[in-house]
């Protein structure tokens, strides 16, 4: 009944297994990949014909994590998985980016790739396993895919690269000074296709070394998929790339001159309008059959690409007049919004980001529910890309995959320079509103985010800047690396290579390559140019702000207090009674974590002090010899019980009440009376012994010994 094919190798200290032929047999390609005890299933289906008029490649990738994979039940009212989480969205993009360029040019049939996490051992991250499963499923499906690809995660600890670090090693990268890198790489046998990383100020050489290490480490996986496909692959789908040479030749002859003139215009909107006019002029001269040809859009793109790329390769001139290494003009402004905690307007050429920082308390931390367990994040970065930023009318709604991905890239770039939570106990939310875009808006978000946080008073370890690099690589081997690319250079070029960091090193690197043949020499040149560009941008940013501003008057003030964990129960009280009383009495917000760290927040410093004192009175231990204010709670023949130092009670013996003989404490005291007492010590049972007669009841000061004697004589 089943025709199972199974292959296994030892990889990175774990067993990696690929299996097909038993599950999802009606899919064009189905593979279950297992690393350790983490199993991921990838299923591929594709349409056997393109839709009429289809002028793009409709590839859809869905990565989904099932809670049962880790033995968990989903939260929420419905108790089932709902819309994709941020991690699922980011992993879908992680799979999509390296495989998309490997489909045969001209293939426009719809392809659907669904990747499902079936089992998670809480050791091996499922994203790498998912990429391997997806690659294997595509390779055996028969779809015209020029893979396979391999994938690997690279860490960097104690000067050594580490293959596929454990989940725990990566989960708290910010809190682990020994682990300085989380890099995911995917590529073919001969070329790197995609890199995604966050780092802690690593050098260009260290980052390039990580890429080389990861590419070499994935080679056994690629070989394994090839062996696997030799046994399990279906017949290749009969597809021949369309021949549109005649159509392209006609389009070129009719409109190359006008299109070249349009690309010579330096202002984006003018250039876009001129390109549209050139297209319209060409279309006006085409026959109905040529206009209906589904390859017309491809012919236009090829013409535009040849003009832009040829000018750069042959003369080094870009469409906005810059050479290959120049960054566009930069203007940085801070404190642009009066009532926000921090704000910045970062403008680089025709790309602009308005970035706002808001400081919150522990209540504002994001709770992340993941397969490996719940966690909290005190740094959030949200990226918004409205249609008006590119002068278009379009969809407006919740953030899409691109916005989530760009926001995470900026988050990765900035998280390395954040202060420790113990030094700066605030939740930080950064929102980047892209108000203009002509390339590299995510890197504008990094620059604006750095300025905005410093404007809010966040003590960053160092300012961060980012720059997007591009590449033109021709078939004859000629190439050019471009600094600070425009939107057209991204769209028509061969590489999008974003690098962010401080003066000391790289904090984030993302690379997407559309062609094979990217050599180490090209990557070294790109990293070197990116460093020069980053240093220039940091210099321009420093003209607006070079260090953290004073703290915003509108931000909440927070003080932290660390208590023994065995005292947490006392501060919270039965059913939260004590903590509610503290909040209601003081007016401050109080947040307690399991480690005994208490954050007290309020816009009113007096409220913070009130809450602080109330908590301290509960958790602190009274000191022998100190004087405290208390209240008489009960009178008995042998003395008075006094409540002091929060909820503590102690006995003032009748002989310690006054400097005269008393027959009963009620001669000088009454219940509810406020008194000043000195802690004399503890009896053999640990009970508190208090005294009053040695304390001046008006001033609360201890009476000098000679005064006691005078009082006794009197």
Curated annotation (Swiss-Prot):
GO biological-process terms attached to the record: mRNA catabolic process; RNA processing
Protein keywords: Cytoplasm, Magnesium, Metal-binding, Nucleotidyltransferase, RNA-binding, Transferase
GO molecular function, one term: magnesium ion binding
Enzyme Commission number(s): 2.7.7.8
Domain of life, per lineage: Bacteria
Alphabetical list of CDD domains matching this protein: KH-I_PNPase, RNase_PH_PNPase_1, RNase_PH_PNPase_2, S1_PNPase
Pfam families assigned: KH_1, PNPase, RNase_PH, RNase_PH_C, S1
Cofactor(s) for this UniProt protein: Mg(2+)
Keyword Nucleotidyltransferase in record: yes
SMART domains (alphabetical): KH, S1
Transferase keyword on record: yes
Catalytic activity: RNA(n+1) + phosphate = RNA(n) + a ribonucleoside 5'-diphosphate
Major subcellular location class: cytoplasm
Residues that bind Mg(2+): 490, 496
PANTHER family with a match to the protein in the record: POLYRIBONUCLEOTIDE NUCLEOTIDYLTRANSFERASE (PTHR11252), POLYRIBONUCLEOTIDE NUCLEOTIDYLTRANSFERASE 1, MITOCHONDRIAL (PTHR11252:SF0)
Function: Involved in mRNA degradation. Catalyzes the phosphorolysis of single-stranded polyribonucleotides processively in the 3'- to 5'-direction.
Protein name per its UniProtKB record: Polyribonucleotide nucleotidyltransferase
The organism of origin for this protein: Cereibacter sphaeroides (strain ATCC 17025 / ATH 2.4.3)
Gene designation: pnp
């Amino acid at each position: 009944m089943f025709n199972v094919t199974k292959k296994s190798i030892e990889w990175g200290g774990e067993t990696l297994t690929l299996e097909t032929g038993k599950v999802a047999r009606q899919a064009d390609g189905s593979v279950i990949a297992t690393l350790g005890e983490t199993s991921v299933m990838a299923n591929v289906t594709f349409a056997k014909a393109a839709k009429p008029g289809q002028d793009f490649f409709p590839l859809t990738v869905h990565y989904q994590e099932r809670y049962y994979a880790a033995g968990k039940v989903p939260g929420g009212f419905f108790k089932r998985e709902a819309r994709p989480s941020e991690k699922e969205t980011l992993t879908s993009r992680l799979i999509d980016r390296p495989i998309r360029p490997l489909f045969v040019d001209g293939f426009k049939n719809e392809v659907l790739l669904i990747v499902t996490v079936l089992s998670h051992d809480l050791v091996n991250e499922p994203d790498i396993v998912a990429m391997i499963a997806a690659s294997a499923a595509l390779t055996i499906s028969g779809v015209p895919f020029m893979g396979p690809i391999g994938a690997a995660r690279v860490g960097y600890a104690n000067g050594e690269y580490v293959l596929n670090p454990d989940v725990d090693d990566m989960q708290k990268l910010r809190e682990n000074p020994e682990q300085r890198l989380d890099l995911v790489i995917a590529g073919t046998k001969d070329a790197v296709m995609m890199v995604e990383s966050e780092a802690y100020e690593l050098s260009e050489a260290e980052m390039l070394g990580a890429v080389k290490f990861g590419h070499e480490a994935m080679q056994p996986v690629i070989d394994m998929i090839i062996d696997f496909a030799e046994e399990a692959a279906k017949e290749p789908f009969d597809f021949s790339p369309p021949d549109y040479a005649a159509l392209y030749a006609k389009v070129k002859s009719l409109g190359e001159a006008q299109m070249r003139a349009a690309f010579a215009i330096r202002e984006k909107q003018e250039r876009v309008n001129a390109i549209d006019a050139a297209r319209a002029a060409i279309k006006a001269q085409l026959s109905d059959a040529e206009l209906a040809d589904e390859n017309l859009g491809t012919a236009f793109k090829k013409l535009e690409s040849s003009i832009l790329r040829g000018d750069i390769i042959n003369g080094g001139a870009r469409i906005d007049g810059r050479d290959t290494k120049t960054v566009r003009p930069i203007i940085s402004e801070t404190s642009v919004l009066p009532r926000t905690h921090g704000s910045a307007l970062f403008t680089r050429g025709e790309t602009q980001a308005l970035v706002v920082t808001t400081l919150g308390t522990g209540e504002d931390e994001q709770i992340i529910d993941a397969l490996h367990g719940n966690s909290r994040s005190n740094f959030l970065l949200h990226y918004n890309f409205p249609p008006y930023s590119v002068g278009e009318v379009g969809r407006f709604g919740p953030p899409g995959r691109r916005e989530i991905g760009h926001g995470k890239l900026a988050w990765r770039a900035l998280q390395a320079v954040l202060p420790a939570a113990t030094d700066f106990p605030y939740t930080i939310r950064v929102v980047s509103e892209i108000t203009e875009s002509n390339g590299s808006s995510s890197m504008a978000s990094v620059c604006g985010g750095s300025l905005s946080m410093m404007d809010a008073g966040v003590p960053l370890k160092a300012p961060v800047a980012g720059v997007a690099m591009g590449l033109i690589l021709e078939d004859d081997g000629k190439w050019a690396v471009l600094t600070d690319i425009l939107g057209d250079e991204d769209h028509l070029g061969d590489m999008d290579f974003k690098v962010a960091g401080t003066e000391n090193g790289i904090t984030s690197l993302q690379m997407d390559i559309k062609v094979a043949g990217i050599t180490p020499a090209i990557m070294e040149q790109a990293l070197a140019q990116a460093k020069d560009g980053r240093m220039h941008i940091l210099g321009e940013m420093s003209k607006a702000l070079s260090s953290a501003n004073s703290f915003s008057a509108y931000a909440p003030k927070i003080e932290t207090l660390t208590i023994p964990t065995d005292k947490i129960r006392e501060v919270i009280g039965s059913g939260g009674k004590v903590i509610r009383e503290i909040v209601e009495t003081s007016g401050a917000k109080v947040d307690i974590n399991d480690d005994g760290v208490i954050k007290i927040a309020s816009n009113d410093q007096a409220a913070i002090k009130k809450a602080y004192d109330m908590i301290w009175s509960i958790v602190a231990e009274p000191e022998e010899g100190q004087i405290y204010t208390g209240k008489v709670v009960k009178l008995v023949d042998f003395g008075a019980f006094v409540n002091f130092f929060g909820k503590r009670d102690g006995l003032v013996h009748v002989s310690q009440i006054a400097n005269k003989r008393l027959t009963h404490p009620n001669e000088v005291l009454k219940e509810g009376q406020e008194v000043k007492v000195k802690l004399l010590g503890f009896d053999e049972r640990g009970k508190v012994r208090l005294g009053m007669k040695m304390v001046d009841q008006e001033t609360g000061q201890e009476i000098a010994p000679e005064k006691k004697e005078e009082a006794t004589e009197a």
